[in-house]
Amino acid sequence: MSKKWLSVMVLAMFMLTLGLAGCGGDKQQGKKVLKIGTDPGFAPFEFQDEKSKEYVGFDIDLIKALGTKMGYEVQIQNMNFDGLIPALEAGNIDATVAGMTIKEERAKKVLFSKPYYQSGLIVAVKNDNNTIKSVKDLEGKRIAVQIGTTGADAAKKIPNAVVREFNNAPEAFMELKAGGADAVINDKPVTAYYLKQGGDKDAKMVGDVLQAEEYGIAMNKKSTELKTKMDKALDEMKASGEYDKLYEKWFGKKQ
């Protein structure tokens, strides 16, 4: 065999190897992937485990279970809460599960799944604060909130209040602990979890729930097919008892 033909055969084998490798990559890329945006500073719904560094929580377990039912591989992407809806609108993610309250203003921009959790806002203050007993006592006070949330919306409606916005709930509670805020307005289950994890040494909840809320999984306005699949999978989880098991894992039995 001439050197010329040998060179041609080597080149052909090399190109074939590249082609096969390319096919493998296409197959990998062809997997049905569901890109989920979340803000992992909202325990017990989504947060980063200190040991494993994995994202865990009720929302994370829920979306993974829903993804399995729909035949998707779920990929979690960490982003700030106020960047979730813009990311959906831009098509950078497929859905977001982040303890997001279903409200009219948001529903103009995104599609929501059926409600998957009932929540509400609550006020938290330092243990030695006996002057703030409800939201009515917050006029003119310094209030720490998470940016872009319904808690922030509620705080901004309080006359003369100084609203301090933070990227996540833990930062808001740290501001309260440090004395930079007189109160925190946040979702009750998140506040209750914070207190349960040791925050009760410094803080307490006061007053009644400010307003009832429902969480939904948000999707791009054009993702009508995904919404249909998501709602169906959620119904199946509730009917089978799988949803209740996840609920009890993170919140205990329903009262």
Where are the regions that the model predicts?
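Sec-dependent N-terminal signal peptides of Gram-positive bacterial secreted proteins and lipoproteins
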Residues: 1-26
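Extracytoplasmic small-molecule ligand-binding "clamshell" domains
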Residues: 30-99
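Short loop->beta-strand "edge-of-pocket" segments that line small-molecule binding or catalytic clefts
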Residues: 34-38, 56, 135-148
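Periplasmic-binding protein-like
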Residues: 40, 118-125, 188, 192-234, ...
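Short helix-initiation/N-cap motifs at beta->coil->alpha
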Residues: 60, 75-88, 130, 147-150, ...
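Extended ligand-binding regions for polar small-molecule ligands
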Residues: 60-69, 147-149, 216-254
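Acidic, polar ligand-binding/catalytic clefts
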Residues: 68, 73-137, 209
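A ligand-binding cleft/hinge motif common to bilobed small-molecule-binding domains
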Residues: 100-108, 154-156, 177, 182-212
